Amino acid sequence: MSCLVSPYLRNQSTDNSPLLTSQILLDCGIGGDSDQEDGAAEEGVARHRVLIFCQLKQMLDIVENDLFRKSMPSVTYMRMDGSTDVSKRHAVVQTFNADPSIDVLLLTTHVGGLGLNLTSADTVIFVEHDWNPMKDLQAMDRAHRLGQKRVVNVYRLIMRGTLEEKIMGCASLSSLPTSRS
């Protein structure tokens, strides 16, 4: 199953997910040279805060190692996945919401499901998707909560010509309401 989700797990030279995610973060004003000038963006300009969702912890490892540690070391991030102790998850969420210097929160879709309030983020990136479209919608809703004052942009990275593209096409059709005559 992992190879269907990300060819990078099978052949490291074929996946552009870290590169694409890097470009989205740069477009959001995160991780570029402007982060290093005076430690932040210009005064009065709101910085974007990002939630990055992956279905598998292995893909979070790829994003963390190849994107943040190697390509974008100036990006500050936190991570929460199934191995995060349940007693520490609330503290991770509270810290991310309260500390505007943290640019990104990496999450697995399942740990970022019901009950979390992450309204400090205004950008959601799905690097890999859950086959159940409702789980992705629940994860997306973490940023679309009461109290959200900014527009939330959602990016879905899907590799063209893959089985994932076909499955996501079917999943989006299955999530549409049916009309009955």
Where are the regions that the model predicts?
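ASCE P-loop NTPase motor core, strongest for the SF2 helicase catalytic module
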Residues: 1-181
